[in-house]
């Protein structure tokens, strides 16, 4: 063997050793992977709190935890933010869906819609859904919403300060939140075209200026207006106009985690899945979490991690109930079927899954989109009865794509009665649960959804977009042969062909069913908390991102401020 060959083998072996020791646990300084089966590296030993999940909720919790002076370890299943550069691009939402930042799952067949299945897109990156979503930042119909759920301590006036303190908007200068948002300019030709199309169909609803969020604070959520997006944009003045010159996605990671990643009380474990929570003999105190972590070579190891004060599950409405059920907290019948010892029989864990049924059709636009914005050309919220005094139950959002100039038209039904559920597929935590979104399981939803869809089609025709074969036109399937002549059947055909999840999952660990809204504790436990969108009893009318930030901040003040 020549010396050059020996040298090559030596270099390859050295590179493999280095690669196998690449970090899976970061605090901004690339901490090395956990050693030992008990997470007994001094960097991770005995934090005050373990936070499971680094999405919108977990990011807020970590920031609040540090501000209250506690030592916290955040465990995140997904990859590092820097491992997938496309997530930073405001115009890259479409590209993200085919990247390593997402996990794709197929839902349980929907017997109400001819056994249709949907694709669920889950985040696989720190920052959670805020790193992969469409970047729409809307307060939603919070006044009506919190009045309807009617939980003491969670009125509109109780939560409003938290909503206001999430964002940093030029239109709300007295509130300097962590999440920078940018609103579409009213002079943007794409918004001008959207406004004209909306006004022709909905003469009774009003434009919300200077943006939807700010205007809605002064009364009445229904309307249309310049959308705010979670994009940090830089502008330069040209004459009297502010012209955007650069922008990046303002995810939960960038807003909350990145600024504190080097804090001495922060430890972050990436590529680390919490398999279950272990309890004391009485089944009342959460003692530790079992973690499976992965290095950059893909090798798995297991460890355990204890917390002095509490364990907070913030893995989202799809994964938090999975962890609870794997831990023996959930419907006893379901757990017994799988042979999981029941710690606490809680029938509502994984139930009441709410979402927004969405029909997405794609057209070719006329006005080009930008490479440095989220390209949300407009959004509107209304009641299908076209009454500005009625609570909105439908929305239309237009999402553009830089380059090919495609326009995704999102027709979103926001007030469904239907509910779904989540069940474990097996006792293996690596197995994706069974997700049943339950769209249209309550037939009362079909009528309003059909009428709302008809209205959005009128808006689309006014925009004069160009249809794209296979992506635009609704084709009547064999089992609905005359769908073109019936509004309800036409909507069902459109949903069957172009139906999607709204990705607005809530309800699976709901307040007053699973979680005490006064403490954030799972009922029956003294240090096991749930803080994420799963605690919403129903999906708010609109996107869930800002709402999740807000309720997480309120719960964080309750949890950390009362110790």
From Swiss-Prot:
InterPro entries per the UniProt record, alphabetical: FAD/NAD-bd_sf (IPR036188), GMC_OxRdtase (IPR012132), GMC_OxRdtase_N (IPR000172), GMC_OxRtase_C (IPR007867)
Molecular function GO labels: flavin adenine dinucleotide binding; oxidoreductase activity, acting on CH-OH group of donors
Keywords for the protein's UniProt record, in alphabetical order: FAD, Flavoprotein, Oxidoreductase, Signal
Residues involved in FAD binding: 48-77
Entries under Gene3D superfamilies matching the protein: 3.30.410.40, FAD/NAD(P)-binding domain
Top enzyme class: oxidoreductase
Enzyme Commission no: 1.-.-.-
Cofactor(s) this protein requires: FAD
Pfam family, one: GMC_oxred_N
Residues annotated as signal peptide: 1-21
Coiled coil, from the record: none
Catalytic residues in the record: 504 (proton acceptor)
Top-level taxon in the UniProt lineage: Viruses
Keyword Signal set for record: yes
Family assignment from sequence similarity: Belongs to the GMC oxidoreductase family.
The protein's name in its UniProt record: Putative GMC-type oxidoreductase L128
């Amino acid at each position: 063997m020549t010396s050059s060959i020996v040298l090559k083998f030596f270099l390859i072996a050295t590179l493999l050793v280095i690669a196998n020791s690449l970090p899976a646990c970061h605090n901004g300084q690339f901490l090395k992977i956990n050693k030992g089966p008990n997470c007994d590296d001094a960097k991770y030993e005995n934090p005050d709190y373990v936070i499971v999940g680094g999405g919108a909720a977990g990011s807020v919790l970590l920031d609040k935890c540090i501000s209250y002076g506690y030592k916290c370890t955040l465990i995140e299943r997904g990859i590092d933010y820097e491992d997938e550069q496309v997530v930073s691009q405001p115009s890259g939402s479409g590209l993200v869906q085919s990247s390593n930042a997402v996990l794709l799952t197929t839902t349980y067949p929907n017997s109400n819609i001819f056994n249709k299945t949907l694709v669920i897109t889950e985040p696989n990156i720190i920052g959670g859904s805020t790193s992969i979503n469409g970047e729409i930042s809307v307060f939603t119909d919070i006044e009506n919403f919190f009045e309807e759920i009617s939980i003491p301590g969670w009125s509109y006036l109780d939560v409003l300060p938290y909503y206001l303190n999430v964002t940093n908007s030029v239109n709300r200068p007295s509130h300097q939140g962590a999440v920078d948002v940018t609103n579409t300019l009213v002079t943007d030709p794409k918004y001008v075209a959207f406004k004209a199309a909306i006004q022709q169909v909905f003469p009774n609803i009003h434009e919300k200026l200077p943006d939807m969020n700010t205007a809605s604070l002064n009364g009445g959520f229904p309307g249309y207006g310049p959308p705010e997006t979670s994009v940090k944009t830089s502008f330069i003045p040209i004459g009297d106009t502010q012209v955007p010159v650069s922008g990046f996605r303002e995810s939960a990671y960038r807003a909350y985690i990145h600024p504190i990643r080097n804090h001495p009380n922060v430890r972050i474990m990436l590529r680390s899945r919490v398999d279950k929570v272990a309890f004391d003999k009485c089944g009342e105190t959460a003692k530790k979490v079992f973690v499976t972590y992965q290095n950059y070579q893909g090798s798995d190891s297991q460890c355990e991690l204890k917390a002095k004060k509490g364990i907070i599950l913030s893995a989202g409405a799809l994964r938090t109930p999975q962890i609870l059920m794997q831990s023996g907290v959930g419907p006893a019948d379901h757990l017994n079927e799988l042979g999981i010892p029941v710690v606490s029989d809680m029938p509502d864990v994984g139930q009441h899954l709410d979402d927004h049924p969405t029909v997405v059709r794609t057209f070719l636009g006329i006005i080009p989109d930008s490479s440095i914005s989220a390209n949300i050309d407009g959004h509107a919220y209304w009641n299908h009865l076209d009454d500005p005094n009625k609570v909105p139950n439908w929305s239309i959002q237009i999402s553009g794509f830089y380059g090919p100039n495609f326009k995704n038209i999102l027709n979103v039904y926001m007030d469904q009665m239907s509910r779904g559920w989540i069940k474990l597929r097996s006792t293996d935590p690596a197995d994706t649960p069974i997700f049943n979104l339950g769209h249209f399981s309550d037939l009362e939803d079909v009528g309003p959804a059909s009428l709302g869809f008809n209205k959005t089609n009128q808006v689309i025709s006014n925009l004069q977009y160009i249809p794209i074969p296979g992506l635009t036109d609704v084709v009547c399937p064999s089992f609905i042969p005359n769908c073109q002549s019936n509004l309800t059947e036409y909507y069902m055909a459109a949903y069957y062909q172009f139906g999607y999840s709204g990705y607005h999952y809530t309800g699976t660990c709901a307040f007053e069913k699973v979680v005490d809204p006064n403490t954030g504790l799972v009922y029956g436990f003294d240090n096991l908390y749930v803080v994420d969108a799963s605690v919403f009893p129903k999906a708010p009318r609109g996107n869930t991102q800002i709402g999740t930030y807000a309720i997480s901040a309120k719960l964080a003040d309750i949890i950390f401020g009362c110790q």
